[in-house]
Amino acid sequence: MGKLLKPSKEIGIVGYGAYVPMYRIRNEEIGRVWGVSNFPIEEKAVPGLDEDAVTIGIEAARNALKRAKIDPREIRAIWFGSESKPYAVKPSATIIAEAIGATPDLEAADFEFACKAGTEALQAAIGFVASGMAKYAMAIGADTAQGRPADHLEFTAGAGGAAFIVGEKSSETLAYFEGSYSYVTDTPDFWRRQHEHYPRHGNRFTGEPAYFHHVITAAKTLMDELGLTPADFDYAVFHQPNVKFPLTAAKILGIPKEKVLPGLLTGKIGNTYSGATMVGISAVLDIAKPGDRILWVSFGSGAGSDAFSIVVQDAIEEKRDLAPKVEDYVKRRKVIDYALYAKARRKYIL
């Protein structure tokens, strides 16, 4: 048996949608407060006082439904991936399902795997639909990531998310999955223990042993199993904790940065964790042409990567304009100072 994950039925994306909060804080403003002058990105998205990972997931799910043009009650599973769920004990997926009118006849659960929780949910959704147990399933990745004040994560931890509705490949699917591959090991590069507010990171594990080892291995294995080369892909979206890592991964794989930049959004909205590659793929689908092939590789600390190859179909031309595009959310911005940012992120202890 090969390593490729390929269901017996061809599965495609029926609808997709993204959402990014309006507020932004520039890295130079964070640096002004903490006396730092070297910045990994330009600015990051900040959730409003009435926003969290669930509200982001709801907005993304609604946009996906607009493009899918289906009755939400036809969705038989909603799986929500996040590491910043508002409840420690209570599923967020049920809130989203209720909000979009999908209840009560469906599966609903929350997934966790650091920044690849959303693509982990997507793998499950693909298998669930391919098994014949559901006509449609929805996978969501959304986060309002936190970084300890003055920690380097504070400069990049952003907010945003995306949702994908999958179904059997047809003339109504806007892209289909050629295959996927998942690769995981026990690598302690990043964690947050119970009752701790901010995550910790093992610096010596962060780069080569964690991100690059898993992303490169997953991408190469997927291409080898499908008999494809980097030249066969028109776009590539990698997990983007910063701007440097995905561009370096692309260079190692022999993929020109021009194929990566359209889906590389961290510099403008920060690292959206579970939403990172899903928002990036949404941005690429907003501009892709029928026949384009896209390499999609997520990464989650702890550690693992999911790699997908998707091919864009004709329906993209009709569906992409049915909901706001990622660029619309990127341009919809209001810059705030550190005081308002700290208030919005509840960093003040009263």
Swiss-Prot record:
<feature type="binding site">
    <location>
        <position position="115"/>
    </location>
    <ligand>
        <name>(3S)-3-hydroxy-3-methylglutaryl-CoA</name>
    </ligand>
</feature>
<dbReference type="InterPro" id="IPR013747">
    <property type="entry name" value="ACP_syn_III_C"/>
</dbReference>
<comment type="similarity">
    <text>Belongs to the thiolase-like superfamily. Archaeal HMG-CoA synthase family.</text>
</comment>
<dbReference type="InterPro" id="IPR016039">
    <property type="entry name" value="Thiolase-like"/>
</dbReference>
<dbReference type="InterPro" id="IPR004656">
    <property type="entry name" value="HMG_CoA_Synthase"/>
</dbReference>
<dbReference type="GO" id="GO:0010142">
    <property type="term" value="P:farnesyl diphosphate biosynthetic process, mevalonate pathway"/>
</dbReference>
<feature type="active site" description="Proton donor/acceptor">
    <location>
        <position position="239"/>
    </location>
</feature>
<comment type="function">
    <text>Catalyzes the condensation of acetyl-CoA with acetoacetyl-CoA to form 3-hydroxy-3-methylglutaryl-CoA (HMG-CoA). Functions in the mevalonate (MVA) pathway leading to isopentenyl diphosphate (IPP), a key precursor for the biosynthesis of isoprenoid compounds that are building blocks of archaeal membrane lipids.</text>
</comment>
<keyword id="KW-0012">Acyltransferase</keyword>
<feature type="binding site">
    <location>
        <position position="239"/>
    </location>
    <ligand>
        <name>(3S)-3-hydroxy-3-methylglutaryl-CoA</name>
    </ligand>
</feature>
<feature type="binding site">
    <location>
        <position position="204"/>
    </location>
    <ligand>
        <name>CoA</name>
    </ligand>
</feature>
<dbReference type="GO" id="GO:0003985">
    <property type="term" value="F:acetyl-CoA C-acetyltransferase activity"/>
</dbReference>
<feature type="binding site">
    <location>
        <position position="271"/>
    </location>
    <ligand>
        <name>(3S)-3-hydroxy-3-methylglutaryl-CoA</name>
    </ligand>
</feature>
<dbReference type="Pfam" id="PF08541">
    <property type="entry name" value="ACP_syn_III_C"/>
</dbReference>
<feature type="binding site">
    <location>
        <position position="206"/>
    </location>
    <ligand>
        <name>(3S)-3-hydroxy-3-methylglutaryl-CoA</name>
    </ligand>
</feature>
<protein>
    <recommendedName>
        <fullName>Hydroxymethylglutaryl-CoA synthase</fullName>
        <ecNumber>2.3.3.10</ecNumber>
    </recommendedName>
</protein>
<comment type="subunit">
    <text>Interacts with acetoacetyl-CoA thiolase that catalyzes the precedent step in the pathway and with a DUF35 protein. The acetoacetyl-CoA thiolase/HMG-CoA synthase complex channels the intermediate via a fused CoA-binding site, which allows for efficient coupling of the endergonic thiolase reaction with the exergonic HMGCS reaction.</text>
</comment>
<feature type="binding site">
    <location>
        <position position="156"/>
    </location>
    <ligand>
        <name>(3S)-3-hydroxy-3-methylglutaryl-CoA</name>
    </ligand>
</feature>
<keyword id="KW-0414">Isoprene biosynthesis</keyword>
<feature type="binding site">
    <location>
        <position position="301"/>
    </location>
    <ligand>
        <name>(3S)-3-hydroxy-3-methylglutaryl-CoA</name>
    </ligand>
</feature>
<feature type="binding site">
    <location>
        <position position="244"/>
    </location>
    <ligand>
        <name>CoA</name>
    </ligand>
</feature>
<keyword id="KW-0808">Transferase</keyword>
<dbReference type="GO" id="GO:0019287">
    <property type="term" value="P:isopentenyl diphosphate biosynthetic process, mevalonate pathway"/>
</dbReference>
<comment type="pathway">
    <text>Metabolic intermediate biosynthesis; (R)-mevalonate biosynthesis; (R)-mevalonate from acetyl-CoA: step 2/3.</text>
</comment>
<feature type="active site" description="Proton donor/acceptor">
    <location>
        <position position="83"/>
    </location>
</feature>
<feature type="active site" description="Acyl-thioester intermediate">
    <location>
        <position position="115"/>
    </location>
</feature>
<dbReference type="GO" id="GO:0004421">
    <property type="term" value="F:hydroxymethylglutaryl-CoA synthase activity"/>
</dbReference>
